[in-house]
């Protein structure tokens, strides 16, 4: 919109013409009427771009601190263990990008090529993109309103040159915010396989996961399943399991049974996970015999099977 004020929510936003920043704008009445809204041409551009990506997976969480970014990183690592599988990891946690640190890519920068932004590669078959690569320092704060965040996500989806990719893993911020709405809107025409939702066993975390599940239902986003992280601690010496965060209401298992949502698995606590993330290395390499590694591998296999079954179903619908 010409003459739009700073903080403009955009003509296609639910707050168009009604937000606080709209007061005094010459376009306020036009936006409020809905006449100024028009289909975003970026949606079609992104659909074309995503034709080279076979599967798209969102990783969500109701709360911060439940291990969502750690899971996203290790999901990407696990999928990429097959050298013939091309994997991309996109970090859209705009205000809290931790993927560069976890993947050992701090200090890397984005490079522009003739076909778009080039991802930063961990391995030949594992590329990463994050707003963290655009910051001069990892300690810099990103203080952006919704429209600017949405523009950044649009640019990531439209302008990053992933090439032919089997899996695109998208790490999102906690909760249900502008970033989630934007990525679902922009990828709607391109098809999203589904979402993996992270939680811990406590009811205070599960309460927000129920909101996340409600969000998925409202925006028609398929749910691959729930992962219960920090599910227990297995002593490396005696092999006995202790509940560090005991589930007060039955944990993720009881919630999934009540809501008829698949429980993909439970990942126990392992001190090596945090150490691996701090060093920017794969936990699977650091602790291949850990019960947490076995839990991760089982969960990743279930996600892979879900995506393959969705692809087979879609191909059957398309075939004559």
From Swiss-Prot:
What's any one GO cellular component for it? centrosome
Where are the Phosphoserine residues found in this chain? 319
The free-text note explaining how the cofactor binds reads:
Binds 4 [4Fe-4S] clusters per heterotetramer. Contains two stable clusters in the N-termini of NUBP1 and two labile, bridging clusters between subunits of the NUBP1-NUBP2 heterotetramer.
State where ATP binds: 62-69
Q: Which Pfam families match?
A: ParA
Q: Localized where?
A: Cytoplasm; Nucleus; Cell projection; Cytoplasm, Cytoskeleton, Cilium axoneme
Please give the name of this protein. Cytosolic Fe-S cluster assembly factor NUBP1
> What is this organism's lineage?
Eukaryota, Metazoa, Chordata, Craniata, Vertebrata
Encoding gene (name):
Nubp1
């Amino acid at each position: 919109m010409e003459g739009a004020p700073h903080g403009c929510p955009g003509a296609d936003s639910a707050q168009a013409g009604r937000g606080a920043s709209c007061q005094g704008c010459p376009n306020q009445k036009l936006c409020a009427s809905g006449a100024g809204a028009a289909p975003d041409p970026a949606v079609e551009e992104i659909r074309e771009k995503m034709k080279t990506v076979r599967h798209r997976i969102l990783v969500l969480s109701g709360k911060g601190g439940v291990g969502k970014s750690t899971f996203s990183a290790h999901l990407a690592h696990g999928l990429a263990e097959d050298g013939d599988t091309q994997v991309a990891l996109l970090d859209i946690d705009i205000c809290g990008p931790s993927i560069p640190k976890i993947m050992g890519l701090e200090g890397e920068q984005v490079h522009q090529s003739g076909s778009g932004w080039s991802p930063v590669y961990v391995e030949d078959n594992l590329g990463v993109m994050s707003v963290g690569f655009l910051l001069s320092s990892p300690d810099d704060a990103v203080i952006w309103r919704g429209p600017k965040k949405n523009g950044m996500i649009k640019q990531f989806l439209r302008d990053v040159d992933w090439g032919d990719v089997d899996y695109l893993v998208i790490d999102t911020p906690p909760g249900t915010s502008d970033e989630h709405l934007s990525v679902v809107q922009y990828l709607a025409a391109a098809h999203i396989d589904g979402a993996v939702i992270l939680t811990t066993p406590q009811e205070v975390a599960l309460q927000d996961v129920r909101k996340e599940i409600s969000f998925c239902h409202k925006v028609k986003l398929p749910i691959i399943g729930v992962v219960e992280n920090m599910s227990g601690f297995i002593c490396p010496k005696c092999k006995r399991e202790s509940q560090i965060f005991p589930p007060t209401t039955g944990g993720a298992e009881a919630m999934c049974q009540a809501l008829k949502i698949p429980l993909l698995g439970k990942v126990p606590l392992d001190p090596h996970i945090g150490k691996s993330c701090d060093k920017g290395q794969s936990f699977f390499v650091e602790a291949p015999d850990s019960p947490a590694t076995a839990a991760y591998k089982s969960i990743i296999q279930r996600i892979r099977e879900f995506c393959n079954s969705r692809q087979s179903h879609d191909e059957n619908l398309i075939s004559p």
